[in-house]
Amino acid sequence: MDDLWEQMAAVARELALAHFEAPPVEPLVLALHYGIPIVPSDGAALWHTDAEHPCLHYDRGQFPLRARFTAAHELLEMLSALGYLDFAVPRELADRSEALYQHGAAELLMPGPLLVAEGEAGDWDLGQLQRAFRVSWEALGRNVLRHVEAVLTIVDNGAVYCRVSSPGLRTPAALDPAERVAVDRAYAAWPSPGSQAVAGPHLRVRAWPVLPERQGVRRVVVLARPTEGD
């Protein structure tokens, strides 16, 4: 199963890099490249095809970043069904197909080589990366963890919403004091768009406000990276 996930990521990455040299990767541009019409829709994004009429419906009512991710997912599924991609979900794993194409969508929109190049150039400034790749903060943060050793924390209205680490790195249950200071500073400066950087004994921490706040939720995204030698 792990091989299938890697194959999906590799196919999506190859597709993105074949058409884009820098972010953002645009799924609708890719669809048009393959001659697939885009049909604006007020309902859920989906695709359908028959022998002569492939078509991708794009949900214009969705939050824009979510709509891009959904379009990437549907495009990969459609290109696979049409035989443009060297990828297929085995019948016995059909119940995992949605998760697989979600995984592929993340790699399509944030192909590893482009993400690493942009990340290293900007010292993994999530604010810059989010603007460059035009994806949600959570999707970006989770993908960044595949390429840099760090702990990602998302805080909503002062409470931890999720906390995850890079593979092989332990996820402490509680926030480090440096993380807490960065979070507190981000909320104190709200709605300033600037990030808050804090250097602790063992961690380099940076916190970004997610603006504008949505539905009364003030979200702060925190990336904590071990200091060299730890």
Residue ranges of each PLM-predicted region?
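Active-site hotspot residues in diverse enzymes, especially metal/ion-binding acidic/histidine motifs
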Residues: 1-230
